[in-house]
Amino acid sequence: MSVLIVTGTGTEVGKTVVTAALAALAADRGTAVAVVKPAQTGVRAGELGDVDLVRDLSGVDDVHELSRYADPLAPVSAARRAGLPTPDLGTVAVAVRRLQADRGLVLVEGAGGLLVRYDHDGSTLADLARTLAAPVLVVTTAGLGTLNATALTLEVMANRGLDLAGIVVGSWPVEPDLAARSNIVDLELLAARPLAGAVPAGAGLLGTGQFLQIARSSLEPALGGAFNAAEFRRRYAV
């Protein structure tokens, strides 16, 4: 897996923290890792963006923000309002392949969900994943409403022939409610596999050393960590 696409079932689901966890684990095992953000929205010039958070949490400096728009909208909408060119996913694919040539892992974090539009032709992160023949890691929420959003994302992936790298809960609550605990089993049924991880809420506020420890316990071995889905299920599921 030299390229991994990280998408979410929506906005503010924990994609950036999960991306940082993946980067931290890769770097810790000695893998040369790069992180690419094709389009950053909702951040003005001079402000810190998602790749800056990834750098701060993971200690990985090889991060690349390819375009930025001030309004917190889909990339195509934010570009239109700013009077700027939309992101070119063909150019993004070239950049990722260039990085891939001498890195062991390239992480590509999308904006919002899988079908958010990047340009006026309707290009999406799903199209980029297909172009790169890269698996997709889906970051989702824990609580009420996650099952429908996750099912829709997985259905789109199946219809487009995209490979699922796993489902990760991006922010597992300190005190999970009934819905969150019940959703563990249902998310695994949707994915037809165990959860690939669950990152504790607040992980994005930790320092680099503590964050690495959390990353290791929050992601499954296939992603570089030591997360045990069966143990997590026994502890929380109802």
Curated annotation (Swiss-Prot):
Catalysis: reaction(s): (7R,8S)-7,8-diammoniononanoate + CO2 + ATP = (4R,5S)-dethiobiotin + ADP + phosphate + 3 H(+)
Organism of provenance: Parafrankia sp. (strain EAN1pec)
Keyword Ion transport: no
Family membership: Belongs to the dethiobiotin synthetase family.
Protein name: ATP-dependent dethiobiotin synthetase BioD
Annotated Mg(2+) binding sites: T16, D50, E109
Catalytic residues (positions): K37
Binding site for substrate: T41
Subunit structure: Homodimer.
UniProt: ATP binding residues: 12-17, 50, 109-112, 170-171, 200-202
Localization of this protein: Cytoplasm
GO CC term, one of those recorded: cytosol
HAMAP family from the UniProt entry: BioD
Any Gene Ontology biological process: biotin biosynthetic process
Role noted for this protein: Catalyzes a mechanistically unusual reaction, the ATP-dependent insertion of CO2 between the N7 and N8 nitrogen atoms of 7,8-diaminopelargonic acid (DAPA, also called 7,8-diammoniononanoate) to form a ureido ring.
Record EC number: 6.3.3.3
Pathway linked to the protein: Cofactor biosynthesis; biotin biosynthesis; biotin from 7,8-diaminononanoate: step 1/2
Main enzyme class: ligase
Swiss-Prot/TrEMBL keywords: ATP-binding, Biotin biosynthesis, Cytoplasm, Ligase, Magnesium, Metal-binding, Nucleotide-binding
